[in-house]
Amino acid sequence: MKILLNGVGRIGKAILKQLDTNKDFEIVVINEINPYVENIVYSINYDSTYGKYEDKFKIVENNYIQNSTSKIKITNFDSLEKIDLKDIDIIIDSSGKKEDIKLLKNLPVIAIFLTHPNNEADINMILGVNEKDLNPNIHKII
């Protein structure tokens, strides 16, 4: 499944590093409000809390970064609805920014995972508490 990761702060970097070697999920786009790809690469490779990332990313072409397992396009849109989503299956929004849920529901993706609580999400899920309530047929924004 192809993923767009929106935001690479503390949570976004942790998600990126967890999914970087996962063969079932591929982060193909990172959308980050920071317009400087060099800063994004540096913050992924040298995190002040998580430390150095062994499989370092580097800039390989204009707005693309790559390491030994992933090649990822970098965008810096201020809204998810402005991004070309034709090849994206899942959005993980770790930006912390509250998006308009009505707009998100119309995006052409299978699911949108918010890493922050939102009263208007289809379900606010906490592993170990209510994950059994998740129904992929009716819950798109999680």
Task: Tell me the role of every PLM-derived stretch.
Residues 1-142:
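N-terminal Rossmann-like NAD(P) cofactor-binding subdomain of oxidoreductases
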